């Protein structure tokens, strides 16, 4: 069974997203948004989502958009390694 793992950078991204969402909207909205991101990671692991090739940004990477954010990940055997979770307006290439 495939599983997903958040890199330390992706975990920090998720915490930043939660914190920003609480400050900007509410803790309830932050929980819903972070849950949507985690659900997308589950979908990647289950095969319900495959994402798109992100080789134009970094070789071997794939991406999946969730709300205003983009999950960057690599598939390695039975593991989906979520590398970063970045806002779509960021300079993505420089942060990977």
Model regions and ranges:
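Arg/Lys-rich, positively charged N-terminal/basic patches that mediate binding to nucleic acids
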Residues: 1-34
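Short amphipathic alpha-helical/adjacent loop interface patches that line ligand
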Residues: 14, 18, 34, 38-41, ...
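Amphipathic, hydrophobic secondary-structure cores in small proteins
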Residues: 21-24, 33-34, 38, 54-61, ...
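Short, hydrophobic secondary-structure boundary micro-motifs
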Residues: 30, 52-54, 94
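Short proline/glycine- and basic residue-enriched helix-capping loop/turn segments at helix->loop/beta transitions
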Residues: 42-46
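Basic/aromatic recognition patch in beta-strand/loop cores that engages polyanionic ligands
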Residues: 49-79
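Enriched for short, Lys/Arg-rich terminal
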Residues: 69-70, 74-96
């Amino acid at each position: 069974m495939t599983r997903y793992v958040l890199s330390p950078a992706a975990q920090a991204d998720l915490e930043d997203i939660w914190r920003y969402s609480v400050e900007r909207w509410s803790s309830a909205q932050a929980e819903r948004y972070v849950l949507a991101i985690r659900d997308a990671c589950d979908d990647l692991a289950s095969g319900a989502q495959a994402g798109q090739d992100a080789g134009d940004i970094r070789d071997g990477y794939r991406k999946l958009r969730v709300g205003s954010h983009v999950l960057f990940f690599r598939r390695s055997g039975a593991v989906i390694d979520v590398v970063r979770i970045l806002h779509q307006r960021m300079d993505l290439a420089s942060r990977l």
